[in-house]
Amino acid sequence: MKILILGIFLFLCSTPAWAKEKHYYIGIIETTWDYASDHGEKKLISVDTEHSNIYLQNGPDRIGRLYKKALYLQYTDETFRTTIEKPVWLGFLGPIIKAETGDKVYVHLKNLASRPYTFHSHGITYYKEHEGAIYPDNTTDFQRADDKVYPGEQYTYMLLATEEQSPGEGDGNCVTRIYHSHIDAPKDIASGLIGPLIICKKDSLDKEKEKHIDREFVVMFSVVDENFSWYLEDNIKTYCSEPEKVDKDNEDFQESNRMYSVNGYTFGSLPGLSMCAEDRVKWYLFGMGNEVDVHAAFFHGQALTNKNYRIDTINLFPATLFDAYMVAQNPGEWMLSCQNLNHLKAGLQAFFQVQECNKSSSKDNIRGKHVRHYYIAAEEIIWNYAPSGIDIFTKENLTAPGSDSAVFFEQGTTRIGGSYKKLVYREYTDASFTNRKERGPEEEHLGILGPVIWAEVGDTIRVTFHNKGAYPLSIEPIGVRFNKNNEGTYYSPNYNPQSRSVPPSASHVAPTETFTYEWTVPKEVGPTNADPVCLAKMYYSAVEPTKDIFTGLIGPMKICKKGSLHANGRQKDVDKEFYLFPTVFDENESLLLEDNIRMFTTAPDQVDKEDEDFQESNKMHSMNGFMYGNQPGLTMCKGDSVVWYLFSAGNEADVHGIYFSGNTYLWRGERRDTANLFPQTSLTLHMWPDTEGTFNVECLTTDHYTGGMKQKYTVNQCRRQSEDSTFYLGERTYYIAAVEVEWDYSPQREWEKELHHLQEQNVSNAFLDKGEFYIGSKYKKVVYRQYTDSTFRVPVERKAEEEHLGILGPQLHADVGDKVKIIFKNMATRPYSIHAHGVQTESSTVTPTLPGETLTYVWKIPERSGAGTEDSACIPWAYYSTVDQVKDLYSGLIGPLIVCRRPYLKVFNPRRKLEFALLFLVFDENESWYLDDNIKTYSDHPEKVNKDDEEFIESNKMHAINGRMFGNLQGLTMHVGDEVNWYLMGMGNEIDLHTVHFHGHSFQYKHRGVYSSDVFDIFPGTYQTLEMFPRTPGIWLLHCHVTDHIHAGMETTYTVLQNEDTKSG
């Protein structure tokens, strides 16, 4: 404790005089909140009243649109009598708190509610007594006073906008941060206690407004889960007409309390988002919530920039912090929607008005300069997801009993099989729509996708669209400019179903009708200087986006810099271009589902469309509509310059990690081999394949991988090339074994028990408590462990700085130009292997090592395995076993490989550099090879276990950091003044979206510039370096910010000690 107080004293002494002091008087009040205060008049036409009533209509056992909530309000002074009015568009968010680097901010908090709450801020410096978060951190007395502000009490939090937590060099002048209550953070936030904190660079504000910005807006995208609110019981009693009938565990009841909202307003009811055409607008965005909170915020009709990159869709997850700049264009009322298709249906949209205020425009009118004309029809086809009938990976028939693929391809009484009637976009030669354009070999990989629409900056695109289908359809483009008369999305902000008003033709092209769209490509929508030459974009039908897209109506678009394309549309200096659309095509949502049941099942009248197994059989995990390696045309030559355009659409299941085995690519200055994609994301990746062979392009999300979202790409030796000129200077040899062990996810339960005691909660633990027949916290697992030599007798003891690795294999190191030799002994009872991301190998096949055998694996580390020029000096890759990469991973086989740039020599760095590798993974023990062993060994009543029981399955999903839960990961210790590299790794399934939050400090990361945050998003296949310079002593929380993951124990602490050099004897 003495050390801690001394540290704070020294920190204060070394801090420069604070530029200015700011005082905010914030009260926590309880009030009634209306999620749709304009009675739901504004909405997408395709959202029927019945759908909105699920969430907005109260009844005997439904709460409806009104909820009791706790909110932060701002007051004028310490009397807490007079509130300061906030902009209406803030909704239920707390007031905006702003600070510039060098400011000292005092938040005077008064709790006017009926239960204890706090104020915890992100991305700003505070000492332990101003953290506002309760967890076991060894603090006592005065340092605990901030942890709970009881009803009627006050507490003053002091926050310091220090240099270490200011926006990074590459960030905008002001960045998004947040504050919220943190006793049980998910419950406090669900109850309403969340608000925006905006941190700015020094001298970037003028009278509290960012200079050179005309309007600013803060928006939170969140599925606010009222089931987690502290006031659920009150809301049931107050708003349900027969509260005694309510079953809180009923799924439909729970869904009715999930409010898909922007700032607490749902179904387009958010007021006040208004601006002038040509206004310079700054958007501060963040997400909040749970696994369902996979958001794609889309600004219809506008183009934005973030970190100097052109964007139009922003992916937000729980606690993702984002800001974007926009010059408002196109007068009219536009939608700001979440393009997660499930969210779109459930009311997650708002409207913003762009008014004509006669501001002078610097934009030239580019219409008519160079017109590219496309003739595109929507037509019906029968589409086969795997024309060969074979799983190209296993060489088995797709309907082989017990195979992963049989679920999707079996045809029978109530199963459709692998062929579906679909609607697709196809290109014709002219407006007569008689001659279809044939696709050449370069295009055969496109599969189900529509034709590539391409244009350069300065072009006008004209698309004559003919609807040969039986439903009204449209074309909505992403990434070009159009006016309201050319918008393909079907909505009317003030639509009244009784008026029977006719929707505009562009957004509702009736069957047999034709419409010509006109879009332009001004400089403001094209690639920026930082962007690649061409941006991947997309177009789709948006009359009912969910149904239209899943029916098959989507295609790729690329928008390129002026003068960068050949006459045939291919990019200059590029040999091959490929378009990949990974998605889970949900055929249950298709417009043609009834037709498919009639055509392909043998007993259509017996089909139950609500049956879960029937629904699962229609979820086609595909790339361009192909599954299990059936995609043709992915061939290239060694040494080619290859551009991959990736894009996706869908819902929260569409969390993709697209892994290119055998090669790496460059993206935003970073070297990677796995690209993360989400609904309506698009990416442009540049690859120079350097090894011949056949490799996989696959989704690492485990359900997608087993479900068939994997293909093969081939690199041929097409021309004589000089041998690999890399001179491999160093050779490193590691002796690694696969060893079976007993692993305890939570060897100590004290931290967890103290946490619940501090929160005044008495909760059982579904994951760690054994109960009558659950497994508990101990499982048999297999892990990678290092040995001293080839005898494999003496294991290498882990040093103190390696204690944090937990279940992970040893942290392997290599420099660019090294050759890494892994002597691998399989000391386990079944075949395993060892394979690393990012490296170069002689063969594309990874040979399994049988039990008892030893094999040698060689990994070369050429330039393309190391960091990009604008990346951190050292980058992480994962290594794991690929015999069955899903079961092997969940059984425990994974570790980090750290690759550094050759000139990066630690000798020249006088400061102490620490390295911590962290794997955030929900270990699904149901998928482990050892599940049966674990039931036999650890369940008290193995004979009572039903492996298909939902609660049993859930109890085996261990939400862990390096295989430890609830504060059990030890060894994350550093000193003030250290330089720390955090190597974050993500693997796993659809639920493995992790927003990693560090209390007490921010970190820096690089994407062609240096950026700062205290939350980083990771997904299956994310490997990222974060750099931290700890300054504030204390024990600090480190956790995933996703609601269920917090409650399930994905939390630990890291310790910052005072620097020994500054201690006085």
Curated annotation (Swiss-Prot):
Reaction equation(s) it catalyzes: 4 Fe(2+) + O2 + 4 H(+) = 4 Fe(3+) + 2 H2O; 4 Cu(+) + O2 + 4 H(+) = 4 Cu(2+) + 2 H2O; a hydroperoxide + 2 glutathione = an alcohol + glutathione disulfide + H2O; 4 nitric oxide + O2 + 2 H2O = 4 nitrite + 4 H(+)
Resulting phenotype, residue 63 to T: Retained in the endoplasmic reticulum
GO cellular component terms listed in the entry, alphabetical order: blood microparticle; endoplasmic reticulum lumen; extracellular exosome; extracellular region; extracellular space; lysosomal membrane; plasma membrane
InterPro entries named among the record's database cross-references: Ceruloplasmin-like_CuRO_5, Cu-oxidase-like_N, Cu-oxidase_2nd, Cu-oxidase_C, Cu-oxidase_fam, Cu_oxidase_CS, Cu_oxidase_Cu_BS, Cupredoxin
UniProt GO MF annotations: copper ion binding; ferroxidase activity; glutathione peroxidase activity; oxidoreductase activity; oxidoreductase activity, acting on metal ions, oxygen as acceptor; phospholipid-hydroperoxide glutathione peroxidase activity; protein-folding chaperone binding
UniProt EC number: 1.16.3.4, 1.16.3.1, 1.11.1.9, 1.11.1.27
Residues reported in the UniProt entry to bind Na(+) 3: 767, 776, 779, 955
CDD domains: CuRO_1_ceruloplasmin, CuRO_2_ceruloplasmin, CuRO_3_ceruloplasmin, CuRO_4_ceruloplasmin, CuRO_5_ceruloplasmin, CuRO_6_ceruloplasmin
Gene3D superfamilies, alphabetized: Cupredoxins - blue copper proteins
Modified positions (Phosphoserine) in chain numbering: 722
Binding positions (O2): 120, 180, 997, 999, 1041
One Gene Ontology biological process: intracellular copper ion homeostasis
Superkingdom per UniProt: Eukaryota
Residues annotated for Cu(2+) 5 binding in this entry: 656, 699, 704, 709
Cysteine disulfide partners in this protein: 174-200, 276-357, 534-560, 637-718, 874-900
Cleaved signal peptide residues: 1-19
Active-site positions on this chain: 699
Residues at which Cu(2+) 3 binds: 182, 999, 1039
Tissues expressed in: Expressed by the liver and secreted in plasma.
Alphabetic keyword roster: Disulfide bond, Glycoprotein, Metal-binding, Oxidoreductase, Phosphoprotein, Repeat, Secreted, Signal
Residues given in the record as Ca(2+) binding sites: 128, 143, 146-147
Task of the protein: Multifunctional blue, copper-binding (6-7 atoms per molecule) glycoprotein. It has ferroxidase activity oxidizing Fe(2+) to Fe(3+) without releasing radical oxygen species. It is involved in iron transport across the cell membrane. Copper ions provide a large number of enzymatic activites. Oxidizes highly toxic ferrous ions to the ferric state for further incorporation onto apo-transferrins, catalyzes Cu(+) oxidation and promotes the oxidation of biogenic amines such as norepinephrin and serotonin.
Subunit structure: Found in a complex with MPO and LTF; interacts directly with MPO and LTF, which allows Fe(3+) incorporation into LTF, activation of CP ferroxidase activity and protection of CP antioxidant properties by MPO.
Protein name, per record: Ceruloplasmin
Source lineage: Eukaryota, Metazoa, Chordata, Craniata, Vertebrata
